[in-house]
Amino acid sequence: RTSAAAELIEKVKFSAVKGNISEIKALMGVSAQTKGVDAAEGDSGSADDAAELAKSFSKKTGAITVITGKVDIITDGKRVFKIYNGAPLMKSVTGTGCMLSALLGAFLAANKENMLEAAAAAVCMMGICGEKALARMKKEDGNSSYRNYIIDAVYNFSEIDMEAAKYEL
C-alpha cells in the first residue's frame, strides 16, 4: 500500500494528502511503525514535530498535508493550522478517516482559492462532529452508536456549529 501511494504521489499532483503520522512518515521514507491504517504509538511525538514533518511533506509534494491525530495538523508548507477538536473515541470507529476524506474533497472543491483554510475547516468540522456525537452517548452505547451519531452530526451540521472550532494558526 505504501509503495502504491508513493508512486501515485510521484506521478500525480494532488491538492491534499491526508494520513496519520505513521502514514506520512512512511511516505517521507522516515522509519515508521504503521499498523494497517492506524498510527503506531511509537510514531506519535509532539504536535510541533508533526507540523515540521507535514511542512516537509508539503514542500516535497506541493500538496496540502493533513496529519490526523490527537492534534490535527494542516499545512501548505508555510502556514500551519493545529486543530484541537475531536474525541478519543473517534479512533475506535472504522471509517472516520474516510468520512474526513469525503469532507476534505468537498471543501477543497468548493474553495479552490483558499484551499488551506478549506482543509482546516473540513478537519474542524469532523472534529466538532466527533465531539457532538460523544455528547450524545449514553452508558449503554457502543462504537456503532457513536459512528451513527457522527453521521447524524455531519448531516445536521450548520454554520453556527463551526463556532466550536478550536485551532491555532
PLM features: residue spans?
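Electropositive phosphate-/nucleotide-binding environments in soluble metabolic enzymes
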Residues: T2, K18-I21, A47-A51, C98, ...
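Conserved phosphate/ATP/ADP-binding segment of small-molecule kinases
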Residues: T2-V80
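Short, small-residue alpha-helix embedded
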Residues: A26, T94-C124
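A generic structural signal for secondary-structure junctions
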Residues: G29-A32, V123, Y155
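Short, well-structured alpha-helical segments that form the helix of a local strand-helix-strand
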Residues: L53-S58, M115-C129, I150-I151
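Short, flexible coil/turn micro-motifs enriched in small/turn-prone residues
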Residues: I64, M90-S92, L100
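Short pre-catalytic strand/loop immediately N-terminal to key active-site residues, enriched for Gly-Thr
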Residues: F81-T94
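Charged C-terminal helix
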Residues: I128-L169
